């Protein structure tokens, strides 16, 4: 990440990813980096990112996820170097159609072939 102009985060929220966008990670980034987080708000230490935005270490931030959702307030709202949108990245018509199709295919695969795909509780089925 020392050479990247833009770093995007697309990971699950869990104990190992909580707070992964923090002052230590930012210190390893290129000066003027731009960060995109459309994964989960819990990845961010907001105070660390805000300080980096204020100092110019981070040139810009784009996000649609927040520590507290729905976000009525955020330290990032109103900052000129931040693009903040509601958490709607997966709410397009196309995304919803794809999710419905995938769910139907996975149910069909299980019923017809006994194949379990993406089952979090597969051992209980």
Label the predicted regions.
Residues 1-20, 28-37:
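Rossmann-like NAD(P)-binding element
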Residues 3, 25, 75-76:
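Structural alpha-helical scaffold elements that stabilize or flank donor/cofactor-binding regions
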Residues 20-24, 103:
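Charged helix-capping and loop-helix junction motifs
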Residues 31-125:
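Rossmann-like dinucleotide-binding domain for NAD(H)/NADP(H)
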């Amino acid at each position: 990440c020392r050479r990247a102009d833009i770093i995007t985060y697309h990971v699950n929220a869990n104990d190992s990813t909580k707070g992964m966008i923090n002052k230590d990670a930012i210190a390893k980034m290129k000066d003027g980096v731009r960060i995109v987080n459309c994964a989960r708000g819990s990845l961010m230490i907001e105070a660390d990112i805000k300080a980096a935005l204020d100092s110019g270490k981070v040139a810009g931030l784009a996000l649609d996820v927040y520590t507290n959702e729905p976000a009525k307030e955020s330290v990032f709202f109103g900052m000129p170097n931040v693009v903040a949108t509601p958490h709607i990245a997966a709410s397009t018509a196309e995304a919803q159609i794809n999710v419905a199709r995938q769910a139907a295919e996975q149910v069909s695969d299980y019923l017809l072939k006994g194949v379990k795909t993406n089952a979090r509780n597969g051992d209980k089925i």
